[in-house]
């Protein structure tokens, strides 16, 4: 039997630092990094104008991503997915992917306060002006209304982190 890679994915509110952390983790683990933002921008340029558009197009790429990730894991390579696991349904999708692939997983929960996330979103707007229309406090509150913190009964391998962007990685097992 061949050795499967490990899948890493993230749970955290908008602005928690999932993309920043995922890049660092992929580099540290020498893993393949897949970014939902990059996939959506490549496949649906200029078509995502609202949160509803995001939900629609995100759902469209999932089947392709799932097969790609399973194929990469089958080679023994680790995969870091910069895709949100912010709801029970999203986390179930990741767990199902892992079950089908026969691989281990680790979910990093970036447990930041709303205030910390909003501060990082404000900084991101300055650094990436093209995101200013979407990276607003109003969108943060709209998206956060759907956020569901993970629970023990989900059977996830969770590492909780208080990573705050450039402040560094603080992990609580």
Q: Where are these predicted regions, by residue range?
A:
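Hydrophobic anchor at the beta1->P-loop junction of P-loop NTPases
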Residues: 10
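Conserved glycine(s) of the Walker
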Residues: 17
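Conserved phosphate-donor/acceptor-positioning beta-strand/loop module used by diverse small-molecule
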Residues: 101-121
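Glycine-rich phosphate-binding loop used to anchor ATP phosphates in small-molecule kinases
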Residues: 57-101, 105
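Phosphate-binding P-loop
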Residues: 1-4
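The conserved Walker
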Residues: 13-14
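Conserved GTP-binding G-domain of TRAFAC-class P-loop NTPases and closely related GTPase folds
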Residues: 24, 115-173
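Conserved substrate/cofactor phosphate-moiety recognition/catalytic segment
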Residues: 20-77
